[in-house]
Design a protein with these regions (language model features):
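Alpha-helix capping at helix-to-loop junctions
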Residues: 118-122, 165, 169-172
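Inter-helical turn/loop segments and adjacent helix faces that build the functional surface
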Residues: 144-151, 170-174
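Amphipathic alpha-helical "output/dimerization" segments
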Residues: 148-165
Length: 195
């Protein structure tokens, strides 16, 4: 019986997500839907344009803490060392990728791991990468304090068959709307919130 209620909850969450396509709240709802199906500790929806710095679209922490300064560090250039960013730039096809598929050898000794990943993403990461021809890349990162299980990766791989098209539809609809704050404005908003 509990599986039935879990399935009902997932379908209801998917319905809510569909109604928010083109709405700024889409990313939060999509993240909550995925969190309902597979446990993870943090998530980041981000757009990497072909030129210029990335734009954070939604940040989620299952257990909120005060780490906005780390996001500023990431957006102000540390993203260049992110193996997922590099995978996006190298033209990996749209899909779900595990950290071990994109990280270089000795990743855990890298500057990026030591200065950002270990404290913010934690232990493991998967990303849903959507290539947007002539625009850039949309990415939805899911981070965990533990390694994702084979079952969780299988479920996320199955979900990617509809998550990626939803991300693409949302992107197309949201381009008709005025854009959110630029990275510099977001950085200013984060600094203001901390003071």
């Amino acid at each position: 019986m509990s599986n039935l209620f879990r399935e009902v909850g997932l379908h209801a969450g998917l319905g809510r997500t569909l109604t928010l396509i083109g709405n700024p709240r889409f990313w939060k709802q999509l993240i909550l839907l995925l969190h309902q199906a597979t446990p993870f500790d943090n998530a980041l929806a981000i757009f990497y344009p072909l030129d210029g710095p990335p734009r954070a679209l939604e940040e989620y922490d299952a257990e909120p803490s005060s780490k906005p300064a780390s996001m500023l560090t990431y957006l102000n250039g540390l993203y260049l060392l992110d193996p997922f960013f590099q995978a996006c730039r190298e033209g990996y096809p749209s899909g779900l990728y595990r950290l071990e598929e994109v990280a270089p050898d000795h990743f855990r000794q890298s500057e990026y791991f030591l200065s950002y990943f270990h404290d913010n993403v934690l232990e493991d990461e998967v990303q849903l990468i959507l290539q947007l021809p002539e625009a850039g890349t949309l990415s939805l990162s899911l981070g965990s304090q533990r390694v994702f299980s084979h079952d969780e990766i299988g479920l996320l791989t199955t979900f990617s068959a509809w998550v990626l098209p939803l991300m693409e539809q949302h992107w197309q609809h949201s381009q008709a709307r005025p854009q959110g704050p630029a990275p510099q404005e977001m950085a200013s908003q984060i600094r203001d919130a901390l003071s």
